[in-house]
């Protein structure tokens, strides 16, 4: 809500127009953006100004990821048909460097509704140089481009006339 603030590595990422965080901007990157700290209400936060609702900081610092590989492939019959994710983190090496990379893809030629497709990619890269326990320098890059088509709400009468509860009023001839 507009009473909440979402930060990524201590930088507020709420949309300045709507006042809300756009979760589609990190779509598919669940593993890369799962490390969070949430403060409820007006309590002091170590990462930004408190909000009436809550303040959440998403930590994508490479040194804070557990070293190793994590991957998954899943099939669904919903908005998308196939999803693949992979994340790899090096941990902090003897020179004080840590790296992390995450990629995901979601695809459907046609989702559960006729005329709906889904094509999304997510990519996150992070590097961090740890100088000592109190000082480090980090760079995080992420993107999540997406194309999709879906249905829209309609009246029960339309579903009954089409004799199909998956009727998509956005698909077909539009006169």
What are these language model-derived features?
Residues 151-174:
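Solvent-exposed loop segments that connect transmembrane elements
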Residues 1, 45-49, 61-65, 98-100, ...:
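Short acidic-glycine motifs
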Residues 10-12, 62, 105, 143:
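A mature extracytoplasmic/lumenal domain signature
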Residues 1-12:
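Extracytoplasmic beta-strand/coil segments of soluble accessory domains associated
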Residues 70, 75-108, 112-152, 171:
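Transmembrane beta-barrel wall of Gram-negative outer-membrane proteins
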Residues 33-38, 53-55, 59-77, 99-101:
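Transmembrane beta-strand segments of Gram-negative outer membrane beta-barrel proteins
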Residues 12-40, 59-61:
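Short acidic/polar hinge/loop motifs at secondary-structure boundaries
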Residues 14-15, 43-46, 108:
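Short beta-strands and strand-coil junctions in structured, solvent-facing domains, enriched
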């Amino acid at each position: 809500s507009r009473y909440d603030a979402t930060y990524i590595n201590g930088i507020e990422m709420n949309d300045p127009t709507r006042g809300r965080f756009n979760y589609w901007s990190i779509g598919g990157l669940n593993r890369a953006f799962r490390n969070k700290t949430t403060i409820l209400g007006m309590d002091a936060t170590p990462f930004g100004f408190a909000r009436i609702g809550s303040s959440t900081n998403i930590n994508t610092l490479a040194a804070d990821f557990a070293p190793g590989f994590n991957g998954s492939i899943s099939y669904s019959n919903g908005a998308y048909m196939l999803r693949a994710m992979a994340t790899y983190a090096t941990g902090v090496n003897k020179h004080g460097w840590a790296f992390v990379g995450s990629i995901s893809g979601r695809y459907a030629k046609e989702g559960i509704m006729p005329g709906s497709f889904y094509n999304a990619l997510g990519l996150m890269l992070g590097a961090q140089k740890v100088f000592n326990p109190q000082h480090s320098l980090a760079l995080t890059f992420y993107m999540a481009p997406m194309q999709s088509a879906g249905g829209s709400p309609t009246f029960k009468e339309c579903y009954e006339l089409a004799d199909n509860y998956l009727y998509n009023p956005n698909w077909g001839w539009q006169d």
